A protein has these predicted regions:
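Fe-S-dependent hydro-lyases/dehydratases of central metabolism
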Residues: 1-337
Length: 337
């Protein structure tokens, strides 16, 4: 990811374009293929698509690819008009867009991270909507995408430079730091290097629930001092364990290698794991046939990740999975006390 993003002031690039996802799908086609450029001042929010689903942005078959640049080739492959794709392969990436605009509740549906990736790796860095689905908003934050509203877009299209702080002021202090440093991976790398100082937790001594005590005991940056947390505090806590599965492990492997180098390592590998449970029965299913090679690549890269990191291996044995990741993690990963 670019070390210079985001800048202190957000300004539109005169050589880039703004794509409006309108309810009139022909207008989208005209922007993609006929050079039509629109302005927010000539439209209303009611003209824009609401409830854009993450399955529309990256249908399940697109997720058989794991490299974001390849995923971007099929951005919005699920948006159909009379049975035909509105976005042909490469249409978003080839359109020269840096801003994408929609209506209410952008990113409903599944939580898949590939949805904002398809925009980010198509050149989109500014995402405009009246509102965002919460998980989709967080996934955009983790990629360092700048999100704003339609009034901000009107100002940008009129030539104004808007301070980054106006885009981030709605968030808590930790989230602002993540955005201001380009997303979760560059933020985490700088935090580990001591280049970022987390805001102090100001909660005074108080009675806490068990969950609050666990979070307080795992706060990053407390340096052994007794800390207290309360609802609403923005904090970062160390995670003792985690897992991934075939649909996500390849991306984890690639992102960590890109950010930390090919020799990256995980802390406490025995508390992390990979599961073979999502694509276990994909082999031999006719509708998965066209994606058989990609599915096998996902499996192979999960094996490579496990061998590289030394995390727990919950691969299938003789075609039988050890269990569903969500359930096994609850049963086997938690240490009492």
């Amino acid at each position: 990811m670019s070390a210079s993003w985001p800048p202190e002031f957000i300004t539109l690039n005169p050589n880039k374009r703004v794509l409006f996802l309108t309810k009139d799908l022909q207008l989208i086609k005209d922007q993609l293929y006929n050079g039509l450029n629109l302005n927010m001042c000539d439209l209303s929010v009611d003209d824009l698509l609401d409830d854009i689903n993450t399955d529309v942005m990256t249908p399940a078959w697109v997720c058989f690819d794991h490299e974001p640049a390849v995923i971007a080739e099929n951005a919005y492959a699920g948006l159909l008009h009379e049975g035909e794709r509105v976005f042909n392969s490469g249409a978003l990436k080839d359109g020269g867009f840096e801003v994408i605009v929609s209506g209410h509740r952008k990113g409903t549906g599944s939580s898949r991270e590939t949805a904002p990736q398809c925009e980010r790796w198509s050149g989109i860095r500014i995402v405009i909507a009246a509102s965002f689905a919460p998980i989709h908003e967080r996934n955009n934050i983790n990629l360092g995408q700048v999100m704003g509203d339609h009034q901000m877009l009107e100002r940008l299209q009129s030539g104004e430079s808007i301070p980054l702080a106006e885009f981030t002021e709605q968030y808590d202090p930790v989230t602002r730091l993540i955005l201001e440093n380009g997303g979760i991976l560059p933020f985490a790398k700088k935090l580990k290097a001591g280049e970022i100082e987390l805001p102090a937790v100001s909660t005074e001594r108080r009675g806490m629930t068990m969950a609050e005590k666990i979070v307080a005991n795992k706060l990053i940056g407390r340096n052994g001092a007794a800390c207290y947390v309360s609802p609403g505090d923005a904090v970062l806590a160390s995670v003792d364990g985690g897992y991934s599965h075939e649909f996500t492990t390849a991306q984890v492997h690639n992102f960590l290698a890109a950010e930390y180098g090919e020799d990256y390592a995980l802390p406490n590998p025995p508390k992390f794991a990979v599961f073979e449970d999502h694509l276990l029965y994909a082999t031999g299913v006719p509708r998965f046939g066209p994606f058989a090679d990609k599915i096998q690549t996902l499996r192979d890269l999960q094996v490579a990740f496990q061998q590289h990191t030394g995390v727990r291996d919950y691969s299938a044995k003789d075609g039988v999975s050890p269990g569903i990741c969500h359930q096994v993690a609850r049963e086997e990963f938690i240490d009492v006390g």
